[in-house]
Design a protein with these regions (language model features):
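ATP-binding N-terminal substructure of ATP-dependent carboxylate-amine bond-forming enzymes
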Residues: 1-68
Length: 68
C-alpha cells in the first residue's frame, strides 16, 4: 500500500516512522515533510494547507491512502 502523509511536524514524523516499519507499506510519501521525515519517506514541497495541491499530488502518485 502506498501512502501519502500530509504535514511536517512531530506527529507526522511519528506516523511516518511507524508506517515505515510495516511490511504492508510500499512507497511512503510526505508533504511538506521535514529533514527527519525525509529519512523514511520521499518528501514534496506542497503546503498542507494547499488542498488542491495535495489532491493533485495524491492523484499523481496514485497513492492508496492519504493520512492528514
Amino acid at each position: 500500500m502506498d501512502i501519502l502523509v500530509v504535514g511536517g511536524g512531530g506527529r507526522e514524523h511519528a506516523i511516518v516512522m511507524k508506517l515505515a516499519e510495516s511490511p504492508k507499506v510500499g512507497k511512503l510519501y510526505c508533504t511538506p515533510g521535514n529533514g527527519g521525515i525525509s529519512r523514511y519517506a520521499e518528501c514534496f514541497d506542497v503546503a498542507a494547507t494547499d488542498i488542491e495541491g495535495v489532491v493533485a499530488l495524491a492523484k499523481k502518485l496514485k497513492v492508496d491512502m492519504v493520512a492528514v
